[in-house]
């Protein structure tokens, strides 16, 4: 089997009967459209705009959304909408480029704009439409997020102009009779205040979709799928103690009971005291078998001398598989020869997207994830990945519904490769110990100040550069630590957390005073995009 590409999830009819097809024209916000549709309780999937006609027809969508994109409809070989989209007789919503492509398809005029609109804007509601009636921030106005160079200047026949801005004559167009709609702005981003309301109106009232994509229904669907996939076979789960693998453990335990064995691998790349904490949490809250494996020496030896981030991820992925294979053999020997055939992982949708191994297959490789692009081709197990098409906040909701403790569910994410991708360059035990101590100080101060709950993810990064410092009357030439904290809902986009200066100062002073090997602390003010959340 191909372990690197996502297969379409087959859901039970009750939860998947009403669904939306999203055709991706390359927008950086495309994944957010899927998030917002699912927030409305409606199942959706996203495919590249040029999938073949049969797949569009067979999908059975009750509505189609055309995403934005970086192209111009005037450019040679620019993306075009498949005619099948408009032959199905279902509602269609075009966003940004999707609106422009739809306008051109039906005979409207699209021009390059003299004034490009990027950022916040206020549009005037000039007309009426099923999509917009009763949805506004103030009297006949909407606060939205624009990101376009071209604009529709002449609406196609049958379309009414619903909204405009001083520089964009058609910000919303609508053909209520055929249920075709175009938005020049991005309803999927949080900066568009009524964006969720607009998308909810489209999927529920215009497409007539029920809100059946709920945590309870997702859990029922997944349990049914897991039972069907696994049968009476044995499953090994690589447990990290993070949200994703914990939810997978709960789902599998509910589906197959004692056919599941969890292996917690202490790689030497964990946070301070994390191994003991994970074992304690699972002993107190989960009735699953957990085996702890001390593999610090194995991982550090495998990583010795390697500084390339992609290579480190792949080494860590391969070493994990070696440890799991070893554990599987030992478990088999201790359980009357029962062979473990399945390996379960906490892979989630952003992992797949950033590894460019999703069903689209068109994204640039940003970074491999050890449980996606970092797995060996000759993997001896069949993969079980029940969260592979879910976003992080959906996973958290599943965890809460499954009854996992809030402390476990609300933990900040920790990457599978652990500190291996938070130590820039070569990984050594010395660097790992320094980073562990610095990270623990950062977490302690965040929790004391109440900022841990206000941030989605925070951590320290070891930088393999030295900086001159002064301690007393002496010179200190030591390492640099960077602090990173972000605010995000879905981890597809994020902004750096605006921590109070006095908090940053406290953390910085403690790290430099308590860790002799550190002489300087910096704070990362990069947002995603263009940066990723993790440094490597």
Curated annotation (Swiss-Prot):
Reactions this protein catalyses: XMP + L-glutamine + ATP + H2O = GMP + L-glutamate + AMP + diphosphate + 2 H(+)
Domain GMPS ATP-PPase span(s) in chain numbering: 213-411
Protein name: GMP synthase [glutamine-hydrolyzing]
Lineage, broadest ranks: Bacteria, Pseudomonadati, Pseudomonadota, Gammaproteobacteria, Moraxellales
EC category: ligase
InterPro entries cross-referenced by the UniProt entry: Class_I_gatase-like, GATASE, GMP_synth_C, GMP_synth_GATase, GMP_synthase, GMPS_ATP_PPase_dom, NAD/GMP_synthase, Rossmann-like_a/b/a_fold
Metabolic or biological pathway, per its Swiss-Prot or TrEMBL entry: Purine metabolism; GMP biosynthesis; GMP from XMP (L-Gln route): step 1/1
Entry's EC annotation: 6.3.5.2
GO terms for cellular component: cytosol
């Amino acid at each position: 089997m191909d372990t690197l590409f996502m297969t379409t999830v087959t859901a039970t009819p009750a939860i998947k009967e009403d669904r939306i097809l999203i055709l991706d024209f390359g927008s950086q916000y495309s994944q957010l459209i899927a998030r917002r549709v699912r927030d409305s309780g409606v199942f959706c999937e996203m495919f590249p705009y040029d999938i073949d006609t049969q797949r569009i027809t067979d999908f059975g969508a009750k509505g189609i959304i055309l995403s934005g994109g970086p192209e111009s409809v005037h450019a040679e070989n620019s993306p075009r909408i498949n005619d099948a989209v408009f032959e199905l007789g279902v509602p269609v919503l075009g966003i940004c480029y999707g609106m422009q492509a739809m306008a051109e398809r039906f005979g409207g005029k699209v021009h390059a704009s003299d004034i490009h609109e990027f950022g916040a804007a206020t549009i005037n509601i000039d007309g009426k439409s099923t999509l917009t009636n009763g949805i506004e921030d103030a009297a006949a106005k909407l606060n939205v997020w624009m990101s376009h160079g071209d604009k529709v200047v002449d609406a196609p026949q049958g379309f009414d102009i619903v909204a405009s801005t001083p520089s964009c004559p058609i910000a919303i167009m609508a053909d209520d009779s055929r249920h075709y709609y175009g938005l020049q702005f991005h309803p999927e981003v949080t900066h568009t205040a009524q964006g969720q309301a607009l998308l909810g109106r489209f999927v529920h009232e215009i497409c007539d979709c029920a809100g059946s994509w709920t945590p309870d229904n997702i859990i029922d669907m997944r349990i049914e799928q897991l039972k069907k996939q696994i049968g009476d076979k044995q499953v090994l789960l690589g447990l990290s103690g993070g949200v994703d693998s914990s939810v997978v453990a709960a789902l599998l335990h509910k589906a197959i009971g004692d056919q599941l064995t969890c292996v917690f691998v202490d790689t030497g790349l964990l946070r301070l005291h994390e191994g003991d904490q994970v074992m304690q949490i699972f002993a107190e809250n989960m009735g699953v078998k957990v085996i702890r494996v001390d593999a610090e020496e194995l991982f550090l030896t495998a990583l010795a001398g390697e500084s390339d981030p992609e290579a480190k991820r792949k080494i860590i992925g391969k070493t994990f598989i070696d440890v799991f294979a070893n554990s599987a053999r030992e478990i088999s020997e201790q359980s009357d020869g029962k062979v473990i055939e399945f390996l379960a992982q906490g892979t989630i949708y952003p992992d797949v997207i950033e590894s460019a191994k999703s069903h689209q297959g068109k994204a640039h490789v940003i970074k491999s994830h050890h449980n996606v692009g970092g797995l060996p081709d000759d993997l001896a197990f069949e993969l079980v990945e029940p969260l592979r098409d879910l976003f992080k906040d959906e996973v958290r909701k599943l965890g809460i519904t499954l009854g996992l403790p809030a402390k476990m569910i609300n933990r900040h994410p920790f990457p599978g490769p652990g500190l291996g991708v938070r130590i820039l360059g070569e990984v050594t035990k010395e660097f790992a110990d320094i980073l562990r101590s610095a990270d623990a100080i950062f977490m302690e101060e965040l929790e004391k100040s109440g900022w841990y709950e206000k941030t989605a993810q925070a951590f320290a990064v070891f930088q393999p550069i030295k900086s001159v410092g002064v301690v007393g009357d002496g010179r200190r030439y030591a390492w640099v630590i960077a602090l990173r904290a972000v605010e995000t809902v879905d981890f597809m986009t994020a902004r750096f957390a605006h921590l109070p200066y006095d908090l940053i100062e406290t953390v910085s002073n403690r790290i430099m005073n308590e860790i002799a090997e550190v002489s300087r602390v910096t704070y990362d003010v990069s947002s995603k995009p263009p940066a990723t959340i993790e440094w490597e």
